[in-house]
């Protein structure tokens, strides 16, 4: 199956997001190859070319600080309509060495030119090992962190993380934060994260993390693995209801209507 092409610029969109309305994406990763700390089986950008937490060799390929600031400022001053400025893109945005500084600048530009626009982050949670990233999270209106699995083995099978990434550490960092959202991709097939035991373990972690809400959804775009399949809207709603009952957390299902 053909996957989606990588984003070729610093900014992309605005795209119509099921969760964010009109979202103007900010891509902090390379344009010509996929650099990420995960190699998820369901990623619509395809397989990860460089799966690592260490960006030392790749810094020269990252968007430069001044270029990102300039692009965001130009968009903020334009007539473009958008509801969110969203750190996302071709890989994990929090791995950019100046991520925290860029959060400060994007918030400053937003406050000056687009005070009604919110700033969002879509993250796979691995960058939380860095203190500067953790300190920047309260400045973001909607920080959304990935948790796809309830157990370490399934985490490795679904997200296929860089060798430096450990499931227990990701959980500990998520539990140390407050006022965040979680996002979870649910899939069936090989691998699957919707089995009874897997969901039970997952809901226990959600209860401990205590996010403001959880967004669950399935695949609706091309993926690199033909052995996985989507979860129906009816099943997503059923899982969301089960999760709300077991955790007391607001869990919302998103899907194409």
What are these regions (language model features)?
Residues 1-19, 30, 52, 70, ...:
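Auxiliary Fe-S-binding modules of radical SAM enzymes
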Residues 4-8, 27, 87-90, 166-171:
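Generic detector of contiguous secondary-structure segments
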Residues 22, 36, 115-117, 249:
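Residue-level signal for beta-strand positions within conserved beta-sheet cores that form or flank
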Residues 9-46, 84-86:
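N-terminal pre-triad scaffold of radical SAM enzymes
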